[in-house]
Amino acid sequence: MKILLILACAIACTCGERYCAMKDDTGLSCRNGTASDCESCFNRGDLIWHLANWNFSWSIILIIFITVLQYGRPQFSWFVYGIKMLIMWLLWPIVLALTIFNAYSEYQVSRYVMFGFSIAGAIVTFVLWIMYFVRSIQLYRRTKSWWSFNPETNAILCVSALGRSYVLPLEGVPTGVTLTLLSGNLYAEGFKIAGGMTIDNLPKYVMVALPSRTIVYTLVGKKLKASSATGWAYYVKSKAGDYSTEARTDNLSEQEKLLHMV
C-alpha cells in the first residue's frame, strides 16, 4: 500500500494536471480545476482517482490478507488456515487467467512488447503450477497423505505405531526428530499426533518423506517413565532411499518393513 501511495505521489508531481484528485460534490468536475472531468480520468484507469475513492476498502482487504497470512496456521485457527490454503490454491489459476487475458488485450492494440511479457508470465506461472502438482503427487505416492497437496508442505513426518501411520507436515528436513509422550499422548514438533500410546508402542524408527526420497531416522536415545506413560525419544538420520512410509500390518520384521520399497 505504501509503495502504491509513493508511486501515485510521484505521478501526481510530474504530471498532476492529467489526474483527478477526487470527484467534486456538485458533479463530475475535478477538485483541482483541470479541464477534463473525473469520469474520463476514471475510464482511463488513473491511479490517483482509484486510491482517493477506494483506499478504505483496500485497507480492509489488506488487513484481512495480512491477518490470514500471519495467523493462518493450524495452532491458531483451522478456519483461518483453511482460508489461507484456499487463497494459495486459487492464486495459480487466477494469475494464469490474468496473464492470458492481458496478453490478448495487448495483442489487440498491437503492443507486442507487453504481449511478450504477458506470454512469458503465463508460461512461468503454468510451469510453476505443474511443478507444484508433480511434487505433490510424488509426495502423496510416498505417504498417501492429503497433506502432500498443501502448498506450504516441503516434507512430511511419518510415524508408524499401533498398526497405523501418523503424519505431520513439515517446512523442511529436521536434523533430528523428538517424540514426546505425555500421559499416553504422543507429540511431535509440539503437535499431538496420537493418543492411547504406551512406552512399548514407541517406534524404533520414524521417517521424513520428501518428493525425491524418504529419510529414515533411527532411535538413539530415550527417557521414559512407565508408571505415567511419560517421556521422550530421540531419532537421528540413518539412511535415505526410495522407501514407503505406509504402516505395514502383515508379519514382517522391522528390517523387512524398512526395506519395503515404493
From Swiss-Prot:
One Pfam assignment: CoV_M
GO MF, any single term: structural constituent of virion
Membrane topology value: Multi-pass membrane protein
Assigned keywords, A-Z: Glycoprotein, Host Golgi apparatus, Host membrane, Membrane, Transmembrane, Transmembrane helix, Viral envelope protein, Viral matrix protein, Virion
Entry's Gene Ontology cellular component terms: host cell Golgi membrane; membrane; viral envelope; virion membrane
Family matches, as HAMAP family: ALPHA_CORONA_M (MF_04201)
Record's protein name: Membrane protein
Gene this chain is encoded by: M
